UniProtKB/Swiss-Prot annotation:
Its EC number is 3.4.22.-. It comes from Lysinibacillus sphaericus. One of its GO terms (cellular component) is cytoplasm. PROSITE patterns: NLPC_P60, SH3B. GO terms for molecular function: cysteine-type peptidase activity. Involved in cell sporulation. Hydrolyzes gamma-D-Glu-L-(meso)A2pm linkages only in those peptide units that have a free N-terminal L-alanine. This is Dipeptidyl-peptidase 6.
Length: 271
């Protein structure tokens, strides 16, 4: 059975308990596979990026046919940190839902010119709403960029989360953790990497030597991951810093963090 997330975000827990560890947030419009239905309206699900956990039934829409159609039609994502979907194309209109960066929508006006101020979108429930056109971007389903462009795009995507508060298990501008930041930077550029802070076989990130490291590659530490920006700098969702920020591997740099620079366990790269 397949389903679509219809909440702003579906919290994914390590156990079927609201007090259990939050391990991920599945964003609006993302499809999930229902592996098991449990009592008390809990579901055990697998995301499209192959991460598993427990979510609540009322956060998703159950319907194989609707989900399959949605996967084919919904090819746009929210590019803004937050965006309100409104009932009418005017700022005074009633809000239907607020969505975060990376949420998936069906662009009903996909053939209109890019200078149209408002775009009609369809929600997973079938409801039509409107949002500012510049806040909606085509979804990159698969990475097709040449290496230099891809690396630059991943870096810019990661930097768009600067100052986002740290949230364990978070994956949005409301709050994000280290692996959530890196996985979203790659996902929004068409590459699925493992959600947690380690290199896992079966995913495209492979270990390389540090002398080959370039911008867009990943630095792994014990229980932590960061994205390399080049020039000794890296961006990460730092529990110690309370938010997404930039630090340096260079001990002479004012942004140097010795605790991280001296504990690198691996460098990971798509290339």
């Amino acid at each position: 059975m397949n389903a679509i997330v219809i909440a702003m975000m579906a919290n994914l827990y390590a156990e079927p308990d609201l007090h259990a560890e939050l391990v991920d947030e599945i964003l609006y419009g993302m499809p999930v596979q229902i592996i098991e239905e449990l009592e008390n309206d809990w579901l055990y699900v697998r995301t499209a990026y192959r991460y598993e956990g427990y979510c609540q039934r009322n956060d998703v829409l159950f319907d194989d046919a609707i989900t399959n159609t949605w996967i084919q039609k919904a090819q746009h994502v929210i590019g803004q940190r937050f965006a309100d979907v409104l009932q009418e194309p005017k700022i005074q209109s009633t809000k239907i839902i607020t969505l975060v960066k990376g949420s998936i929508l069906y662009n009903v006006d996909s053939d209109t010119t890019s200078n149209t101020p408002w775009t009609a979108v369809q929600l997973a429930t079938g409801e039509i709403g409107y949002l500012r056109s510049q806040w909606l971007h085509p979804k990159i389903a698969e990475h097709t960029f040449e290496e230099h462009a891809f690396r630059e795009n991943v870096v810019q995507t990661a930097l768009s989360y600067i100052a986002t508060p740290y949230r364990w298990g978070g994956k949005s501008p409301l709050g994000i953790d280290c692996s959530g930041l890196c996985s979203m930077a790659y996902l929004l550029n068409g590459v699925i990497i493992f959600r947690d802070a380690r290199i896992v076989e079966g995913f495209p990130i492979k270990e390389i030597t540090i002398d080959r490291m370039q911008k867009g590659d990943l630095l792994f530490f014990p229980g932590h991951v960061a994205l390399y920006l080049g020039q000794t700098l890296y961006v990460h969702a730092s529990l110690g810093g309370n938010e997404v920020n930039v630090n340096s591997l260079d001990e002479q740099h004012p942004l140097y963090r010795q605790d991280l620079a001296t504990t690198i366990t691996a460098i990971g790269s798509l290339f």
